Amino acid sequence: MDFFPVVENQQPPATMPLNVSFTNRNYDLDYDSVQPYFYCDEEENFYQQQQQSELQPPAPSEDIWKKFELLPTPPLSPSRRSGLCSPSYVAVTPFSPRGDNDGGGGSFSTADQLEMVTELLGGDMVNQSFICDPDDETFIKNIIIQDCMWSGFSAAAKLVSEKLASYQAARKDSGSPNPARGHSVCSTSSLYLQDLSAAASECIDPSVVFPYPLNDSSSPKSCASPDSSAFSPSSDSLLSSTESSPQASPEPLVLHEETPPTTSSDSEEEQEEEEEIDVVSVEKRQAPGKRSESGSPSAGGHSKPPHSPLVLKRCHVSTHQHNYAAPPSTRKDYPAAKRVKLDSVRVLRQISNNRKCTSPRSSDTEENDKRRTHNVLERQRRNELKRSFFALRDQIPELENNEKAPKVVILKKATAYILSVQAEEQKLISEKDLLRKRREQLKHKLEQLRNSCA
């Protein structure tokens, strides 16, 4: 099929839809379905194919800049991606050690080869987002960087054709019979992946994406500044992967039998864990750097605002302090029962007023309610104690008319008065006993006189 050479020989296309399906075997029809996008002069047939096929992508005029944009950051390294040496890849690329053309799959048609390359590369071929070695000097002179709008798909087509030729050569070299068929398949796929790693130098310049120079390999954690979190989640995952594997080899696509590739779920879980660890480390590094942020602006122009401290709303609780030196105004004005009712009403009013200014947080509300209830009960207890002192003072003859008597004097005088009353009580009890005995004696003497007279 001459699909890719036709695309190269055309005028610079208006755009190339990113979701063209390569699963159809008839590639001429696929090219015809996208042909109106390469000839923008035919305005009468520009939207004709969109009404006929449901797989037709949206027109360039709807959202044209989404078709030109590249990924803001390169994806993860291909060694961490699933499906490179998975059973699905082995099923797509059957290999025969004999190299014949029978049902063993020794030779591939052009459509099968395109399907295999499309499944391996996925969306990275169309999106032009291959992983490159940052220490390589050739990727800076890439044609995709020179003109990322028009020469992207032609470069991808050229890369696919070169990789197909290298893959066929590697397959012919390894065509000797082996005892195990699966081992030959894995070795062939590893050779093809090494070719991909060699060609990965033709990728996007990371200096366009990252504001930091990539040749500084002394501190890989310097990219994990708080400014790097403003780019995209993929950059965070890339930084976290570089931090977690500082001893990674320069060939990231060399597969070994002792280390099987991780599955998609495992890689996603590891990526989430590494992202969480990276977020924690960024927050820890951000804390000591808050002093220097105010003095010098950040390099990328994006900086997170520091978290504002938690503001707790406090409600003013009115406390009435009693002046013990002042005369009690409620002692003679109201009786005791009426004073208790007034105090209870006052307590309920204070509780209802204090509940209106409570904090919206549940924990703060509970603490404030407990504190308020404790204060109200304590105030009520003090009032009851004060009234008890006033009642005790009224019972002491010496302090009955002294309204400014302190509590200590009241207690001392009350103790002395109680002791004196107890002594007088004992004295009266002894006198009562003497009088009872005297009565018994007189009564007995009266009986004797009556008997003598009779």
Swiss-Prot record:
Q: Which residues are glycosylated?
A: T73
Q: Which UniProt keywords apply?
A: Acetylation, Activator, Chromosome, Cytoplasm, DNA-binding, Glycoprotein, Isopeptide bond, Nucleus, Phosphoprotein, Proto-oncogene, Transcription, Transcription regulation, Ubl conjugation
List modified residues, type Phosphoserine.
S21, S77, S86, S96, S166, S174, S176, S308, S329, S344, S359, S362, S363
Query: Sites of the modification Phosphothreonine?
Result: T23, T73, T330
Which molecular function term from Gene Ontology is one that the record holds?
A: DNA-binding transcription factor activity, RNA polymerase II-specific
The protein's matches in CDD domains, at most eight in alphabetical order, are given as:
bHLHzip_c-Myc
Question: Where in the sequence does UniProt note compositional bias of the Low complexity kind?
Answer: 216-252
Question: Main site of residence?
Answer: nucleus
Motif annotated as UBR5-degron, chain positions: 370-379
One Pfam annotation reads: Myc-LZ
How is it used in the lab or industry?
POU5F1/OCT4, SOX2, MYC/c-Myc and KLF4 are the four Yamanaka factors. When combined, these factors are sufficient to reprogram differentiated cells to an embryonic-like state designated iPS (induced pluripotent stem) cells. iPS cells exhibit the morphology and growth properties of ES cells and express ES cell marker genes.
Q: Where is this cross-link: Glycyl lysine isopeptide (Lys-Gly) (interchain with G-Cter in SUMO2)?
A: K67, K158, K163, K313
Bias (Acidic residues) occurs at 266-278
* Stretches the record annotates as Leucine-zipper: 428-449
**Cellular component per GO, a single term:** nucleus
Q: Where is this motif: 9aaTAD?
A: 115-123
User: Region Disordered: which residues?
Assistant: 216-310, 349-380
Recorded coiled-coil stretches? none
* Post-translational modification comment from the UniProt entry: Phosphorylated by PRKDC. Phosphorylation at Ser-344 by PIM2 leads to the stabilization of MYC. Phosphorylation at Ser-77 by CDK2 prevents Ras-induced senescence. Phosphorylated at Ser-77 by DYRK2; this primes the protein for subsequent phosphorylation by GSK3B at Thr-73. Phosphorylation at Thr-73 and Ser-77 by GSK3 is required for ubiquitination and degradation by the proteasome. Dephosphorylation at multiple sites by the PNUTS-PP1 complex promotes MYC stability by preventing ubiquitination by the SCF(FBXW7) complex.
SMART domains the record matches: HLH
Q: Where is the bHLH domain?
A: 369-421
Q: GO BP, one example?
A: MAPK cascade
Function as written in the Swiss-Prot or TrEMBL entry = Transcription factor that binds DNA in a non-specific manner, yet also specifically recognizes the core sequence 5'-CAC[GA]TG-3'. Activates the transcription of growth-related genes. Binds to the VEGFA promoter, promoting VEGFA production and subsequent sprouting angiogenesis. Regulator of somatic reprogramming, controls self-renewal of embryonic stem cells. Functions with TAF6L to activate target gene expression through RNA polymerase II pause release.
Q: What else is known?
A: Alternative translation initiation from an upstream, in-frame non-ATG (CTG) codon or a downstream ATG start site results in the production of 2 isoforms with distinct N-termini, shown in this entry as isoform 2 and isoform 1, respectively.
What domain notes does the record hold?
Answer: The 9aaTAD motif is a transactivation domain present in a large number of yeast and animal transcription factors.
- Name of the molecule in the record: Myc proto-oncogene protein
Organism of origin: Macaca mulatta
